[in-house]
Amino acid sequence: MKHEGFHGRAGFGQRPALLVIDVNVGFTDPASPLVCDLEDVVAAIRRLLDEFRRAELPVVYTTVSYDEGDKVAAAAFIDKIPALLTLEAGSRWVEIDPRIAPLPSEPVLNKLFASAFYGTPLSSLLASAGCDSVVVTGASTSGCVRATAVDALQHGYRPAVPREAVGDRNQAAHDANLYDIDTKYGDVVSVDQVVAHLEELGAAHAG
């Protein structure tokens, strides 16, 4: 079935930020009940980190962790996904995977729910940095990546999602959510396309 009026292009924008969503040890270590297979995703994010840092563009990380008060605030979410209790504040599970560790200047925002915008200063950080768009990476495609892409659009930022730099526990969910994002909320692109855009921005600024 063909649906007219969908699959337009939002575009990258002139000052993108890289969002690294929940690539913490609790999602990458096989010993965790929340683990995703993110080996290839981590490699793709490392490449994007190199390019964004080279271009001196903003990078923002998120993690998920819960102290005792947070467990009350997020009780309904935790009841739905009891494995979230693994993400105890201060534990190794909430630390960013060391293969893509943040620089001291790169903020790591803690969130309690799916979207990186909900209950965090992310929108203010992006506005202060003069960003007009975001490149959303991390996990999981059907959960926090999708929620962040939708909220990015609703906050006025053009979202792009590099397909090699996001991952999920379920391939069908991954594919379906990338389709939905590309149809309605943002642009699903390749890592090569993101890198090419950053190179174009660099050439334009140099000129």
Where on the chain are the PLM-derived regions?
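Active-site-proximal loop->helix
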Residues: 169-182
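Internal catalytic-core helix/loop-beta-alpha segment
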Residues: 90-139
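Short glycine/serine/threonine-rich phosphate/pyrophosphate-binding segments
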Residues: 141-148
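Glycine-centered short loops/turns at secondary-structure junctions
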Residues: 54-57, 130, 156
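A short glycine-rich beta-strand->turn/loop micro-motif centered on a GG-aromatic cluster
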Residues: 135-138, 158-171
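Short acidic-hydrophobic, aromatic-tinged amphipathic segments that line or gate anion-handling sites
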Residues: 109, 186-194
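Active-site acidic carboxylates
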Residues: 1-103, 107, 198-207
